[in-house]
Design a protein with these regions (language model features):
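Non-catalytic nucleic-acid substrate-recognition regions in nucleic-acid-modifying enzymes
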Residues: 1-48
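Class I S-adenosyl-L-methionine-dependent methyltransferase catalytic core
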Residues: 19-23, 28, 43, 47-52, ...
Length: 257
């Protein structure tokens, strides 16, 4: 753990992710920043264009906020394990944030699966936050699997990575949890994406235990909500907007069995 011992002020930037109208959000941000300056004795100074600290407030479903802090003045070491990445890789800081938000729904010693694991970041961050017993990562992209194995080794994680299509995957026992960064649509049509999500929910129902959990990061809110409407075997537990600009959401969904 590293910390600063300084006598001069730190400059910060505030970012708010909420459903507030823009004018109210701007007013709230100004008042919040001013109060931060006052309470810190001006050791924290609002400087949106030249800052050392980034504060991010994420509105929760109950109306409260989760607060995240990023120190840009300390060299990153927390995510040094991520030596390999591919184009679709999630940033490890984002993965860590998603797992932190989903933590109330996660359990220790679970058997977990990432069906589109890429270079393994979601599984690694999940196990760091809440240790699991058995961890499986699947990806159709061989280069990603090779990178995932190396990243897991650097992180000191024991994860079973398999180069396979999720829809062809079978296993001897059921899983407590499926956690994944869902593939982006790319060049797929709406009809193809709709069919993909239908297949995904059907396949996952065959791999999850009763009361098992889906933790999904996706910008296809409409297709996920459609599956929740037409399928009685799933129930939405939590939904959180993460990136408002391009509509990426975190979903926590229970499989009722």
């Amino acid at each position: 753990t590293q910390a600063h011992r300084e006598t001069t002020p730190f400059y910060f930037r505030l970012e708010i992710k909420s459903h507030m109208p823009l004018d109210k959000k701007s007013t709230f941000a100004r008042r919040f920043s001013a109060e931060m300056e006052r309470l810190s004795g001006r050791m924290l100074v609002n400087a949106p264009s030249d800052y050392e600290i980034e504060l991010r407030l994420l509105e929760k479903r109950d109306g409260g906020y989760a607060c995240f802090l990023k120190l840009l003045s300390i060299a990153p070491g927390r995510f040094a394990y991520r030596k390999n990445a591919v184009a679709a890789s999630i940033h490890p800081a984002t993965a860590a944030m998603l797992v932190a938000l989903a933590e109330p729904y996660l359990k220790e010693n679970a058997q977990i699966l990432d069906p589109f694991c890429g270079v393994g970041t979601m599984l690694i961050e999940r196990d760091i936050r809440v240790p699991a017993r058995e961890k499986y990562g699947i990806d159709i992209f061989g280069e990603a699997i090779r990178g995932a194995r190396e990243n897991a080794s650097y992180a000191g994680e024991k994860i079973n990575f398999i180069n396979r299509d999720y829809f062809d995957f079978t296993h001897a026992y059921l899983f407590d949890e499926i956690i994944t960064n869902m593939p982006v649509r790319g060049r797929k049509s709406k009809e193809e994406t709709d069919a993909f999500y239908s297949r995904f929910f059907e396949k996952s129902a065959g791999l999850l235990k009763a009361d098992g959990i889906l933790v999904l990061y996706s910008n296809e809110q409409g297709f996920i909500r459609k599956q929740l409407r037409i399928r009685s075997d799933y129930r939405l537990l939590a939904e959180q907007c993460i990136r408002e600009k391009d509509q990426f959401y975190l979903f926590v969904i229970q499989y009722k069995g």
